[in-house]
Every structure is written in C-alpha cells, then in structure tokens.
Amino acid sequence: MCIDASSDDIKRFMMPRPAEYTETNQRIIPINYGKIAAAALDPIEKKPLRRYKRGSMILSVGSFGCNLSCPFCQNHRISMTDAGHSVTKDVNPYQLLDAAKEARSAGNIGVAFTYNEPLIGYEYVLDCAKLIKNAGMDVVLVTNGCICEDPLKELLPYVDAMNIDLKAFNAGFYKRIGGDFETVKRTIELSQQACHVELTTLIIPGENDSPDEMRAEAEWIASLNKDIPLHISRFFPAYDYAHKTATDVRTIYELVDIARGSLNYVYTGNC
C-alpha cells in the first residue's frame, strides 16, 4: 500500500501507535517491507492454535520491530530491535508464496506471520496474504491486535486464523506498554466474526494475575463467543523483566479454572 507522503493521516490510518516508514519519490514504504528475520516450519499448535487444523504444519515468518514496548517481551531479540540491528533476508511476496508451496511436501498448509508484531509490516502482510489465499493456502496472524479498524477490515478477508494477545484486561496495563485496550478489544470483536480466533494472555506476577481480572476477561470473551479458545500462559523472566520471578504454576491453573467458568476451551501455556 502506498500513500501520498504529504498525507497527515497515514499514521492514524494504520495504528494507534505507528510503525516506521520511509519516503521514496513521494511514496511511503514501511522500512521492514519484505525483511524476514526469522522463518521456520512449525506445528500450528505452536502459534498457539489448538482448535484450528490440528496436526498441520505452517511456514512461519517474522520481521523485526513492534508497536508496543512490553518490558516482559518473550521474543525481544527480534521484536525489540530495528533495521540497523537486524539480520534479515529480502523475500518479496512471490518468493514467500513459492517457499510456502515448496513446503507443501512437508505438510505445510500456508503462512503464519509471527515472531515479531506482523501488523507493523501491514503492507507486506496484505500483499502476501492476497497471493497465499488465491493459491488456496492458509493465512495465519499472531498479533497484539493494535491496529485501526479500517486497515483491519481490509485485511480480514484474506485471513483464516489469528492468535491475538490479550495482554491484560485493564486499560492501565495497556497504557504502560504504549497500547490501547479498547482498540485491542475491537480487533478481537471484528476478527472473531471473520475468521478463527484464539487468544493468549501471558500472566505476569503482580501485574495481571488477579482472579477478578481473569474472571472479567473470561466473561467478556464469552459475551462474544464461549467457544473462543483462551491460552493462559506462564511468564518466564526475560528482557527488562529478567530479574522477575517466573509465574507460579499454581497461579496458572487457578486462573484456568476461573476462565473455564465462562469459556469452553481454556488451555495452559508454558507449564
């Protein structure tokens, strides 16, 4: 997608907290377009997607950067870096499609955009998704859900499944990491109407681990659809929270029990 460089609306159009763009001959181009920092053929359950084409493999790719600043980031080596500090390979949309097709012999069903925040590379994801979908293969997003409504609606027809991070169920938490709680909720609402959606909440001791917060989260998810799977994952010390203590396994199971009071499919993660 190219937008006139004189437009004041480009950043507001894309995300509440925008990605980086560069200007070339009055064309706005994201600096990470086609820059692949990580790629692997993964089990789809690893995304995690537990109730979508179980047993399948999917070509998983990621670039660099993120539109949030989570001090607990579990994948900070690529998500919390920039173009000047990333080792990447240029892969255009047609090359990615070819790679996905070649991996069919190993059980590949499509492409998952993951590892970093894929939607800061929105234009690349959209261009690739159209080709992949047209080839009869699956498109999966693993995202924090921080994207404005209009570009999300443009992308959703080409997406088959998503895992969306619901990092906490309070606005203050999102404000601290540079996000917007209501935007993420709206992304979940729209996405679950258009494709298969699963959610993940990483439980951090003392920050989003209260029973009342999990109860409110599960009840809200159930108000959309009781069959939306929720993954409640254990935090391990990482990045700026390397000094923290890992989440007690008992806490995870207690929160899972609470969530199961409202939802049909609740899973533990990292336990």
Residue ranges and their predicted role:
Residues 236, 246-271:
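A C-terminal junction/extension of Radical SAM enzymes
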Residues 23-24, 66, 204, 235:
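Generic structural motif
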Residues 54, 89, 180, 248, ...:
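Short, conserved glycine- and acidic-residue-centered signature motifs
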Residues 93-247, 255:
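Conserved AdoMet/S-adenosylmethionine-binding subsite of the radical SAM
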Residues 27-28, 68-70, 121-122:
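Short active-site-adjacent helix-start/loop capping segments
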Residues 15-16, 26, 33, 38, ...:
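Generic secondary-structure boundary/loop-capping signal
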